[in-house]
Amino acid sequence: MQYLYLATVFAGALVCLLASILLFVRRKEAKRSRVILAVIVSFSVFNYITRFIALCNGETPELVVSAKLLLQANFMVLGYILYPIEVIAPGWLSFQRILKLYSYWLLAVVVYLISLQLGVEYTPYGSLLGMLAHSGSFEVWFRLLLSVLIFAPALIVFFIHQTRLYRNSDHIWVRKYVLTLSVNMLAYMLVLMFNHPEFKILYYYVSVGCSLYIEIGRAHV
């Protein structure tokens, strides 16, 4: 199982790397959406490579319900909504608006750092289910909140789409994109809830598959 896990992580890194390079090479003039998606996928490449190196060195992977990994997951999901926003409303994204989209994530990071300074100890749990019995403590409900917030970006996409800010809308594509992202998030939630090796391997395949579907599903963007 360990070798299969290693091979899966390596394959994920390779596929995402090739996809990121292809997106950047095929970028269109005056079109930022492909560049944005290429940058987002490159973050996945970095995550896969660092995990692969750690596993090869015999390091124990950090628990999926650690506050740091949950913050990282929220960062990645927020990154993936930048692409459809740019497609829906070309040119709407600016540095200030990206900061606004990431505002609740930045607030969560600040709360996490302050909690560490105040001496809060984050008990290692293997899964969300294992934490529920201790939900009365701050370090547990904070991580539960981070788990719920993973689904928030999908609502942001629909909010942007329903405003009059967009000029290049495709209702069917937006629904497919949000559905694909939701499948990815649900697969990740299974890992958070049960934390079995089989679910981790399944999640990597689902994640890479969803990324490829996103990249080829809107080839004209």
Regions picked out by a protein language model, each given a short descriptive name:
Residues 1-28, 147-160:
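First transmembrane helix
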Residues 2-16, 32-46, 50-92, 97-114:
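Individual alpha-helical transmembrane segments in multi-pass integral membrane proteins
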Residues 20-28, 81-88, 163-164:
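C-terminal ends of transmembrane helices
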Residues 27-49, 101-103, 131-195, 203-210:
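Alpha-helical transmembrane segments of multi-pass integral membrane proteins
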Residues 50-60, 114-127, 163, 187-198:
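Juxtamembrane "helix-exit" motif on the non-cytosolic side of transmembrane helices
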Residues 59-71, 127-134, 198-209:
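Non-cytosolic membrane-interface motifs at loop->transmembrane helix junctions
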Residues 93-147:
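Membrane-anchoring/interfacial helices and their immediately flanking loops
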Residues 219-221:
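Conserved small/polar residues in nucleotide/adenosyl-binding loops
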